[in-house]
Amino acid sequence: MTQSLADMRREYTRDGLSEANAPSDPFSLFRQWFDDAVKTERLPVEPNAMTLATVDADGYPHCRILLLKGLDERGFTFFTNYESAKGRQLAANPRAAMTFFWPALERQVRIEGSVEKVTPEESDAYYQVRPLGSRLGAWASPQSRVIADRAELERLLAETERRFADQPPSCPEHWGGYRLLPQRIEFWQGRPSRLHDRLDYRRQDGGWSRERLAP
């Protein structure tokens, strides 16, 4: 390393997050922040990139970067192979956490809740708008399984291309969406001297409570 990790730091200088300007519904605030990120973050950064954390049957946590592909009043939707490691973990423990980080805005959002599969119709609707290569890849890749080498993956793809040479690929039964149903959403805004703003929303009596947390 060319620089000590202890010396790596930056000061946060953007506007704060106050209760007076924060809506009572966290979905409204998330949409506002997400729209800001889309306008502010520059490619190749993907504003819908998030860290998804799951826990396996033995209690070990796992995390990886995914892309958010849907948002409505029910929750946050992403898609994957149901037979992948994350799919098996969610089958054993259908709870997860998401983290979005938008460094240009000095903002972070943490989301926690239970997870459910979306309907086959929802999965198919998204699958059909994916690029052809991605649709074929959903069939070809035995996600999270050990393979011999890159050549094996390319062979599987070639077999899949031949299989669907005369017809468009349909959505595989082993592939589809999950929806995280949030119970807690925390908004973090970087502030000077590490005295950050944190607003914590929690499901309560059919609505949402909101509290400020110390940084």
Curated annotation (Swiss-Prot):
This is Pyridoxine/pyridoxamine 5'-phosphate oxidase. Pathway: Cofactor metabolism; pyridoxal 5'-phosphate salvage; pyridoxal 5'-phosphate from pyridoxamine 5'-phosphate: step 1/1; Cofactor metabolism; pyridoxal 5'-phosphate salvage; pyridoxal 5'-phosphate from pyridoxine 5'-phosphate: step 1/1. Keywords: Flavoprotein, FMN, Oxidoreductase, Pyridoxine biosynthesis. It catalyses: pyridoxamine 5'-phosphate + O2 + H2O = pyridoxal 5'-phosphate + H2O2 + NH4(+); pyridoxine 5'-phosphate + O2 = pyridoxal 5'-phosphate + H2O2. Coiled coil: none annotated. The gene is pdxH. One of its GO terms (biological process) is pyridoxine biosynthetic process. Catalyzes the oxidation of either pyridoxine 5'-phosphate (PNP) or pyridoxamine 5'-phosphate (PMP) into pyridoxal 5'-phosphate (PLP).
